Amino acid sequence: MFWADKIAADAQGYQVVNDSKTPSGRVHVGSLRGVVIHDVIYRALKHAGKPVKFTYGVDDYDALDTVPKYLDREKFKPYLGFPLCNVPSPGEGAPDYAKYFINEFFEIFEYLGIQPETYFLRDLYRSGKLNSHINIFLKTTHLVRQVYKQVSKADRPENWYPFQVICENCGKIATTVVTDYNGSEVFYTCQPNSTNYVQGCGHSGWLSPLNGNGKLPWKVEWVAKWDVLGVTIEMAGKDHSQKGGSRDVANAICRQVLEKQPPFHSPYEFILVNGTKMSSSKGVGSSAREIANLLPPELLRFLMLRTQPRTVINFAPNYETITRLFRDYDTLISKYEVNPELTEELMSLFYAQLGDEVKVFQPFDYSTLISLLQIPRLNIQDEVVQRSANSLTKYDQFIVNQRIASAERWLEDYADEEEKLVLYLEQVPEKAHGLTSEQVTYIQKLAENLESATPWEPEVLQTIIFSTTKELNIPPADAFKALYLGFINKEKGPKAGGLFSYLEKSFVISRLQEITALYL
């Protein structure tokens, strides 16, 4: 059984699936994994006929703790330590920093067919919806301290309280420390040295903790959100889910302070881009927007779903990785077309769709599109029509156009020079002047064998290319190296049969003869 369907099968009663994000900067693609995982759990519950709601929170009362490298540091440095919702917007179209970055993320939700009910922490605090929980946790601070010590070995002092005030003098929230509570107000100090990235102003005083004047620390806040929203399912990343980590602390607070069961939880792994874990505030890795611009929505969902949640996804948008992603997706589409029964293998395909059905199409190989786009004077739409086994439906054409746009974007933004195909149409490339006698003999024989190639199609040409290596007993690697050097001046390239099929037969044979003539 697919992992999300198992969660749905075990769930009893009304379910609230929740996820959240701190909009500290441009949201990276790694954050999409949690979003898609929660969306799929929500869909699995709906698929199982169970009552369910999907909520997504914006943790915009968290402090700005770093100025991302892509923003003007001098402009935003004065706002370090401020709640994100109180920091100016980096651009037009949003009233503040938090909404500026989360709006872009929500656009990607829509692109991926994800439609949760969204909420902002500023609204929960300012409206008073968290007031009762603030009072509860301030009155049971000794229990909260006890949990921190038992679960995470964090020893809080006797005058520590689980609350941070927004300083009335300087507006920072990261620098304030609450050291007393009289039942209605907290006493706080905006300490100069409470963080390593910004100084507090030194102001102190008594203030009501209610109605948006401050926030709970996020492990405690997490528990308050669960209770207020009625959350029954919330997964968390591996970093939060380690023994003694933030999820263990939150679970224990939920049980020992509120005396309630925490939501169902199972950890999920990171997405690495080129082996690097991504960070929104540090700007490390590819942003969710960049990857959404590269991949069609179903393929981006499929990237998140083709591996188990507890398995790391290492996504390097190089030629091998991206062409394999499309190829794996097309394989499942073809299997579904033959037998439209939703087996466990096909559930990742089903949940990759934007709706509740799998729309089959005639797959056109993505790697072939990448090659075709690099052939001079070639009409790619005509080539697709000619190379397709059947006439294209409107939906087939839609998918092809989507993939052409993706391949163009990949070539422009992600392909390195070794992955690009530069055909030498006017003359024999320089590196083809250094072939071995064995390679030259192969080139000469291949020119003869290709004269009879009919039809001039990839499979036929690839067969002749291979059979000629056997005929002359030359290692295939040496033979292919000679071909690539003779046409693209590189030692490696796309399938030679496919490459030749894009070119005129007369040109290919003529080029092979030109190479041979260099050694006569």
Language-model-detected regions and their locations in the chain:
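N-terminal catalytic cores of NTP/NDP-binding nucleotidyl/phosphoryl-transfer enzymes
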Residues: 1-72, 223-242
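The substrate-binding groove and active-site-proximal loops of carbohydrate-active enzymes
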Residues: 23-29, 84-96, 122, 126, ...
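Residue-level signal for inorganic ion chemistry
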Residues: 28, 137, 296, 483
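Charged, often glycine-rich, active-site loop that binds/positions anionic groups
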Residues: 61-78, 133-134, 277, 283
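A glycine-rich helix N-cap at a beta->alpha junction
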Residues: 75-108, 112
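Catalytic adenosine-cofactor/nucleotide-binding cores of aminoacyl-tRNA synthetases and other
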Residues: 242-243, 247, 257, 269-413, ...
